[in-house]
Amino acid sequence: MRSLLYKAIESYLQGNIDKHVANVKIQAENAVGVAEHPDHIETIDKELGKIAEFEDRLEVLRKYFKTKEVL
């Protein structure tokens, strides 16, 4: 059960990282004025903050909770 929970949390965090990386790439490649995102720099900065947040959480998970039992 612990292994299943660990893998689920790890996948959740990595999925969020991938989502926000994709958002930055889309924003950078399609920098067209959109009503919801008029300030491209601010939008990308927010996405980078979310990437950093999820990467920090993933690092903590791997540092403190990854054991041989989980592998």
Q: In which residue ranges do the predicted regions lie?
A:
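Extended, charge-rich alpha-helical interface modules
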Residues: 1-71
